[in-house]
Amino acid sequence: ARRGIQIDVFTRSQDPYIPMISQGLGYGARVIHVKAGPEQPLPINDVYLYVDEFAQAIYEFAAEENVTYDLIHTHYWLSGLAAGQLREKWPSIPIVHMFHTLGRMKNRVATTDRELAPPERIEGEQKVIEIADRIVVATPAEQAQLHWLYGNRSKKEVVVPPGVDLDKFKPLPREAAKAHVGIPVHDRSILFVGRIEPLKGVDTLLQAMALIQERYPSAVKKVTVTIIGGDPWAHDPDLEMKRLQAMREQLGIRDIVTFIGARDQNELPYYYAAAEIVVMPSHYESFGMVALEAMASGTPVIASEVGGLAFLVQDGENGFHVPSRDPETLAERIYELLVNDSCRERLGRNAREHARKYAWSNIAEKMLEVYDKLLMPAEEKESSRSRHVENPL
């Protein structure tokens, strides 16, 4: 929007009392809440039932407002399917899509049936691959997964990682940040941020903390592990939250680990800055936005060596890699950073510098290049192609 591009962001209305059109993203960008199914939060798999209604609502809004769009950029497979519906009405508008996560990858790491992606998601993702003119992937690993798991050989993919707001996520005086979020200023803070689901590996973190308490009891006397995500006070908390809370009791780490539920985005920078360590023990991450936000805050990350985390976190340079589902190795790495101040501070400084590469201004330029190439007139595309083709002779 800051480059003079008018942007309309469509989302499904979840509250009838929220204005249909919001200017909250700033000049040149609108958030438009359209009715598609009940105006309330729904389980993600139920949203699939209202994709057609969502697409129709977008089409009707554009017609009523007399708006024409040059390009559609969709995120997640459900929005990609909506774009497929719009393609029937707007056949000449190119579609750019970003999956963020892939159902078949989630299925490969699932350990229970309830973690599996539904069949309609797998079919939907395959369809979106066919629909899209360009597929944005966060890392080369995600590109390889599309080829390997979905048989995609279309060469539609372009690697453009997500960006981070370096003004919002930045190093802050740690004691002041701890005081702001209510962590004792002399405690060492370990932080997890994410959805409370088996895929995120919170159980591995709990097991690792129990090992540290057993082996190095003095090291955890002033340690606070904060779990951000979910709703631990819900009248009927979900199965994973119940399982993790029970595990905390069984492992005897109630005094160390605190579940504090979801937090407002504007509060997260203080939690990152307050933490000595951010832990991401995920079994699968297409990128790892939490890791990038932590790194921008100058906080080292210990992450599973999976998916995008294997690219984002550089082992021994700005954080540590550990194998997925390995509480022993995770415990040793956490302990190392708890007791080695110079190592922790070095990794934190390097993390902030590495995060600068992902500044939103840089990422926006890369995305604009993708848009410009798609919108280039056909004759210019052919001319550009001929200039860039190497002569095999």
Predicted regions located by residue number:
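Short alpha-helical donor nucleotide-sugar binding micro-motif in glycosyltransferases
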Residues: 262, 270-275
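Short hydrophobic beta-strand element within catalytic cores of glycosyltransferases
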Residues: 300-303, 313
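A conserved catalytic-core segment of Leloir-type glycosyltransferases
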Residues: 2-69, 392
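Conserved acidic donor-binding segment of nucleotide-sugar-dependent glycosyltransferases
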Residues: 315-316, 320-327, 336-341
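Aromatic "clamp/platform" in nucleotide-sugar-dependent glycosyltransferases that forms part
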Residues: 283
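A short helix/loop element that forms part of the nucleotide-sugar donor recognition site in Leloir-type
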Residues: 170-183
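A short, active-site helix/loop in glycosyltransferases that binds the activated sugar's phosphate group
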Residues: 13-14, 18, 118, 126-156, ...
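A short, well-ordered alpha-helix in the C-terminal region of glycosyltransferases
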Residues: 329, 336, 343-357, 373
